[in-house]
């Protein structure tokens, strides 16, 4: 039986847990709504289940979802929850009017003035107190909006307060309009920096207010929505993202219009013939909130260096297609390529006129019938536009013309294509956020870097380091060490990998001149040293020497060049390979010895069995053994005769004891 204090402590902990957390069932009862409405409300308000510790989860049950009680109580008086309750009351009135056949009341209830509607303005202000917080969520928002923009609606409805399990016409039209506004802003502000074509769709990156925003536009093709997906969850996110992007785009467009007006005013004052767009557009794209007077100076310098690198990146992209005119063939998705061309300062022609066009984008093995090829035009494939954007330079059209085999299309998000400071900083940030990305540099990237900078020489042109990383990946380690099973292997998490990759900073250790001890303690230490019963403390001179040696090694490692580091890594890998080879050889020897022992045991056992059978056959031939009456065994003839003679005299022959099975074991086992 538990002690009174222990029982009281358990009771206090249980009561405290009940006050802090609520289950999903308790939350729905408190809010007086169904589970579907509760989930939709949590999505709109940004309330998510909490992950408990293992002990708490074990006590409460593994299948339960827990929410913070203060967040659920905060939802009780929320205006969206009130509107949901109002809508439930309105539904009851509509059903009653339909049942009683009151057409006038039903028409009045279904009018837009009476039907309840909820607003997400206050919710967006609560979730995003600063504009930069909303910018950081634009990537998920635009990816989902672009996905639903090309899906066909299945329900005709303009309101979103009711729960729909398919895309409505109102949300579809809003998504298409939002995509059009977003692409128009990206093209006008010239903030597009990267693009990539993958099997999932088109990946883009833009720099907006000092933040890198990446979004995905899917390929537009005939689709079928997969079953088993709760679409009301996705539509709740879509509704919130549409309302959020309305605020974000209003702010961005107003800032862009203000900057353009200021630029025109300065042009009129100074009488400039050409606007210096960099002074305004880059500042508008990279305007970051004030870091505050209380922040550290290091963070301020880091933000300034990051801003300068992003500004250099935007300046290179903005004038990329300046003075060039592109004609896009009808088989090429014009929306995506027009976005890149306009964002990079180019112009898209609507008619195929030879005097104005410089480049024609065609995705066919030959020109369409009726087209005449002109010498002053370059007929390129669509990948050329993306590769020029990622390289920030007009690449040679060799290899991109019609009918030619295209070079590899490299993703600019995991590899620094230009090898510039801004690209390297962006890739390092991506690797920091996603540690599992392999830093392999393809040969095509080395070619582009050579075109940009003729004096460029690759550190690892053959990709030996990446090959070694692939050899010593998680899957290959199982091959190198056969004794290790899949159950024994535990993969590290992202935080553990980031912690392991941190370089430990050098810390100065204080070495005391003389260690002062009491007389008794000093006498004990002296005796223990003489008797060699303890590890005596290191001498001060030896400690200083070791400390200086470690510090010199750390300084040498931090100051080594990439070539020296590569050579050191290669030598370490070779040493590790030798150790692994030696271990594999030992394992192979043990396996061979075990196999030889097994084979020899089988062979010897077979020979012994054959000798036993031969002896039995010989004894049967000589008459020493004969079959039993049932014919299933053999009987010793001499032993049977002795037993018969003893029975005739009225005596009983002693039976031989059975063999002891433990006799062959060691004595300590017996």
From Swiss-Prot:
Main location as per UniProt: nucleus
SUPFAM superfamilies found in the cross-reference section: BRCT domain
Domain of life, per lineage: Eukaryota
GO BP term (any one): maturation of LSU-rRNA from tricistronic rRNA transcript (SSU-rRNA, 5.8S rRNA, LSU-rRNA)
Chain segments carrying region Disordered: 643-670
Similarity annotation: Belongs to the pescadillo family.
Its job: Required for maturation of ribosomal RNAs and formation of the large ribosomal subunit.
Protein name as catalogued: Pescadillo homolog
Source species: Leishmania braziliensis
């Amino acid at each position: 039986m538990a002690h009174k204090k222990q029982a009281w402590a358990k009771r206090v902990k249980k009561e405290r847990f009940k006050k802090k957390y609520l289950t999903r069932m308790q939350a729905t009862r408190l809010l007086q709504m169904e589970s579907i409405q509760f989930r939709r409300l949590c999505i709109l308000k940004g309330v998510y289940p909490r992950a408990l510790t293992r002990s708490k989860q074990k006590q409460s049950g593994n299948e339960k979802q827990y929410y913070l009680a203060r967040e659920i109580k905060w939802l009780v008086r929320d205006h969206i929850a009130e509107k949901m309750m109002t809508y439930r009351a309105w539904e009851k009135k509509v059903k009653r009017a339909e049942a009683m056949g009151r057409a006038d009341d039903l028409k009045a209830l279904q009018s837009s003035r009476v039907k309840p509607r909820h607003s997400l303005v206050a919710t967006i202000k609560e979730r995003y107190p600063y504009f930069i917080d909303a910018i950081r969520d634009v990537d998920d928002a635009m990816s989902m909006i672009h996905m639903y923009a090309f899906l066909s609606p299945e329900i005709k409805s303009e309101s979103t307060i009711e729960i729909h399990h398919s895309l409505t016409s109102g949300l579809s039209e809003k998504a298409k309009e939002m995509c059009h506004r977003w692409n128009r802003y990206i093209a006008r502000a010239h903030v597009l920096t990267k693009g990539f074509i993958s099997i999932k769709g088109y990946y883009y990156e833009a720099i907006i207010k000092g933040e890198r925003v990446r979004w995905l536009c899917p390929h537009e093709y005939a689709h079928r929505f997969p079953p088993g997906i709760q679409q009301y969850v996705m539509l709740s996110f879509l509704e919130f993202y549409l309302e959020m992007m309305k605020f974000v785009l209003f702010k961005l467009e107003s800032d862009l219009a203000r900057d353009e007006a200021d630029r025109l005013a300065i042009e009129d004052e100074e009488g400039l013939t050409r606007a210096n767009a960099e002074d305004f557009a880059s500042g508008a794209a990279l305007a970051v909130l004030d870091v505050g007077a209380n922040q550290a100076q290091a963070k301020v310098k880091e933000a300034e260096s990051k801003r300068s690198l992003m500004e250099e990146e935007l300046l290179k992209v903005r004038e990329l297609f300046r003075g060039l005119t592109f004609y896009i063939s009808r088989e090429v998705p014009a929306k995506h390529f027009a976005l890149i061309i306009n964002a990079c300062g180019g112009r898209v022609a609507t008619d195929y006129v030879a005097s104005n066009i410089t480049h024609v984008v065609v995705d066919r093995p030959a020109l369409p019938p009726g087209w005449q090829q002109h010498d002053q035009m370059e007929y390129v494939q669509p990948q050329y536009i993306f590769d020029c954007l990622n390289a920030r330079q007009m690449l040679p059209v060799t290899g991109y013309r019609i009918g030619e085999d295209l070079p590899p299309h490299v993703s600019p998000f995991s590899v620094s294509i230009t090898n510039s400071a801004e690209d390297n900083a962006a890739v390092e940030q991506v690797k920091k956020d996603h540690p599992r990305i392999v830093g392999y540099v393809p040969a095509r990237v080395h070619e582009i870097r050579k075109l940009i900078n003729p004096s460029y020489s690759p550190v690892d042109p053959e990709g030996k380091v990446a090959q070694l990383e692939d050899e010593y990946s998680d899957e290959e380690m199982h091959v190198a060490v056969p004794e290790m099973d899949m159950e024994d292997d535990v993969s590290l998490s992202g935080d553990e990998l980031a912690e392991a990759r941190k370089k430990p900073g050098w810390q100065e250790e204080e070495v005391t001149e003389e260690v002062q001890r009491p007389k008794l303690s000093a006498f004990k230490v002296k005796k223990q040293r003489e008797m060699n019963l303890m590890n005596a403390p290191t001498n001060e001179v030896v400690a200083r020497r070791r400390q200086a040696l470690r510090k010199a090694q750390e300084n040498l490692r931090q100051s080594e060049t990439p070539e020296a580091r590569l050579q050191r890594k290669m030598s370490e890998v070779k040493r590790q390979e030798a150790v692994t080879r030696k271990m594999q050889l030992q394992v192979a020897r043990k396996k061979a010895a075990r196999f030889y022992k097994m084979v020899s045991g089988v062979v010897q056992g077979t020979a012994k069995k054959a000798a036993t059978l031969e002896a039995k056959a010989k004894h049967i031939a000589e008459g020493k053994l004969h079959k039993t009456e049932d014919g299933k065994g053999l009987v010793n003839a001499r032993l049977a005769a002795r037993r018969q003679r003893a029975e005739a005299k009225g005596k009983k022959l002693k039976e031989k004891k059975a063999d002891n099975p433990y006799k062959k074991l060691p004595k300590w086992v017996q």
